[in-house]
């Protein structure tokens, strides 16, 4: 695999298993990764451009400070994936498990997350533009310091989010009536039975 500022381009990998490797600062350009397993692999500082991940598994992996541009992450398992301070631009996550993942301090633009799990994931202090969630599990998502204004969460499971004391992250978020009732308990409201 690429090690330190290496370049992997115009290729495909099927069923490859990589463990305890460092591909830091490598560039992956126009690459298909299908059914691959990564265990303890450090992709810190890597560039992923026009990369498609299909059915891949990431265990104890880090993409800290990585740049993902025009990437598709489809039907992957990546619980606990570290994307701290990553830059994501034109990225699709579909039917992917990102539970416990850390996307804190990431810069996100034109990212769609569909049918995916982000249970107890961290998205603290994220700079987000054109972020779309649909039909995803966002239970206990930590959005401390991340504004959700204009982001439609109405088709998602969005319960017990981690927020700042004044709940400012929720200002302008689009939620369903049922979600609004659930979130109102954070403010101490008690809903009367009719």
Residue positions per predicted region:
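Tandem repeat scaffolds
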Residues: 1-194
């Amino acid at each position: 695999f690429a090690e330190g500022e290496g370049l992997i381009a115009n290729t495909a990998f099927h069923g490859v298993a990589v463990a305890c490797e460092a591909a830091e600062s490598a560039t992956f350009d126009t690459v298909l990764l299908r059914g691959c397993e990564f265990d303890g692999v450090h992709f810190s500082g890597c560039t992923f451009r026009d990369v498609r991940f299909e059915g891949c598994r990431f265990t104890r992996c880090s993409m800290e400070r990585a740049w993902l541009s025009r990437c598709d992450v489809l039907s992957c398992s990546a619980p606990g994936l570290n994307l701290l301070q990553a830059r994501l631009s034109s990225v699709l996550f579909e039917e992917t498990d990102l539970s416990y993942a850390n996307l804190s301090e990431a810069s996100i633009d034109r990212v769609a997350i569909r049918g995916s799990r982000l249970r107890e994931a961290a998205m603290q202090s994220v700079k987000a533009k054109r972020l779309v969630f649909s039909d995803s599990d966002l239970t206990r998502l930590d959005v401390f310091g991340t504004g959700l204004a204009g982001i439609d969460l109405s088709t998602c499971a969005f319960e017990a989010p981690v927020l700042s004391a004044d709940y400012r992250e929720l200002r302008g978020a689009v939620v369903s009536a049922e979600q609004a009732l659930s979130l109102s308990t954070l403010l101490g409201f008690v809903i009367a039975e009719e």
